[in-house]
Amino acid sequence: MMTRTPFALAALSLAILSGCNKAPEETQKNTVQVESAQAVTAVAPIAKKVPHEMTIHGDTRIDNYYWLRDDERKAPEIINYLEAENAYSDAMLAHTKKLQSSLFEELKGRIQKDDDSVPVKDGQYYYSSQTRGDNEYTTYLRSSDFTGTDQEVILDVNELAKGHDYFAVSGLNVSPNDNLMAYGEDTVSRRVYNIKIKDLSTGKLLDDTLEGTSGYVVWANDNKTVYYIKKDAQTLLGYQVYRHTLGTPQSDDELVYEETDTSYYTGMSKSKDGSEIYIWHSSTDA
């Protein structure tokens, strides 16, 4: 039988004490290193190469990853690959979840929860917006005076967003007689909006819904006609200007202008005195 010397026992005791007295931050560091090492074992997906020849302006090149494009976003092979990429990212970042949560809460804590915009007069009313508490979306209001003594809510996006994973509003625009308001809503995050018309005197929506638009209208002075821009379903480029009369189906709308040059964006605006409507174009290459 082996006999342990006093020296050996003393050395063992010191080693145990040394291990027990490690600083907390050092122990935490080692834990992170272990978790990181586990994350590294995740295998990154490798996209296959499928040569695709493309010729533009007389120049031919090979795009090995062209197969990853699917404008309809339905190809199972592409979806499976993207899911594998996401799974790999989740695995590699798993050890940072607590840190992510901590950073998120810290950043939220810096946000001013209650905020109001400066009222701006348009027609007979002063329009403004506000955010309150933990609400994710804006509430839009109007009042007959700058101080907001008779302030009324004309659109509460928090209410509209209920039941949707994503929701965005754009292009709020009130009719010249201050009675109707048009706005666009997007529930899929494609920046393609369905335009709604709200009667501000009753708070109810009209039956009119204009689909596939850029999200805003320009009102004609008759308070019953709106002009809007329709987007291409694949390129998402706004290129057609339509005229819609309230109370009629969108299929009856009249095409006013169509831009065939895909290098230009199409926009609309109204003159300051309200007498004219402009159709304009812009391009990053022009």
Residues covered by each model-derived region:
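Beta-propeller folds
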Residues: A8-L9, G19-A286
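Bacterial N-terminal signal peptides that target proteins for export
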Residues: M1-A8
